[in-house]
């Protein structure tokens, strides 16, 4: 089976670069599975895990928004933030989740604060899910 090159890039630099059999990303329209020779496209990403499958193994990268650019031989993910599980501070992610939940439960907030807290909660849950903890 042929492979496809994957690059995950943030404003801080490259997070992942490698060849995989399949990439699964979460776009605003739903999950998208990408195999080698996929048609070209660009799609906006939501907060979620990028799954990188090679053989019987799977790696994940926690991504917080951005875009995916697909070409027949390469997938480039331009993310606002992205982390490999080994780079995630689980205690910090748990604390962020608790802060976001408490802000969501607060009665004194406007719509903007609510959306910020909701997004922070999604990011924290995604980071914890990717680490498996």
Swiss-Prot record:
GO molecular function: ATP binding; proton-transporting ATP synthase activity, rotational mechanism
Keyword Transmembrane: no
Any one cellular-component term (Gene Ontology): proton-transporting ATP synthase complex
Family matches, as InterPro entries: ATP_F1_dsu/esu_C_sf, ATP_synth_F1_dsu/esu, ATP_synth_F1_dsu/esu_N, ATP_synth_F1_esu_C, ATPsynth_dsu/esu_N
Membrane-crossing residue ranges in chain numbering: none
Compartments where found: Cell membrane
A Pfam family of this chain: ATP-synt_DE
The entry's keywords: ATP synthesis, Cell membrane, CF(1), Hydrogen ion transport, Ion transport, Membrane, Transport
Family annotation (Gene3D superfamilies): ATP synthase delta/epsilon subunit, C-terminal domain, F0F1 ATP synthase delta/epsilon subunit, N-terminal
Subcellular location, principal: membrane
Highest taxon above the source species: Bacteria
Similarity comment text for this entry: Belongs to the ATPase epsilon chain family.
Xref: HAMAP family: ATP_synth_epsil_bac (MF_00530)
PANTHER family listed in its UniProt record: ATP SYNTHASE DELTA/EPSILON CHAIN (PTHR13822), ATP SYNTHASE EPSILON CHAIN, CHLOROPLASTIC (PTHR13822:SF10)
Protein name: ATP synthase epsilon chain
Encoding gene, per UniProt annotation: atpC
């Amino acid at each position: 089976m042929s492979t496809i090159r994957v690059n995950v890039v943030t404003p801080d630099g490259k997070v992942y670069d490698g060849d995989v059999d399949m990439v699964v990303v979460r776009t605003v329209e739903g999950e998208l599975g990408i195999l080698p020779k996929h048609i070209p496209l660009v799609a906006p990403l939501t907060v979620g895990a990028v799954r990188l499958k090679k053989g019987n193994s799977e790696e994940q990268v926690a991504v917080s928004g951005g875009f995916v650019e697909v070409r027949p031989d390469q997938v480039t993910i331009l993310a606002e933030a992205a982390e490999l599980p080994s780079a995630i501070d689980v205690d910090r992610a748990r604390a962020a989740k608790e802060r976001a939940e408490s802000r969501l439960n607060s009665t004194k907030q406007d719509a903007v604060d609510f959306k910020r807290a909701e997004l922070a909660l999604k990011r924290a849950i995604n980071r914890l899910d990717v680490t498996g903890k």
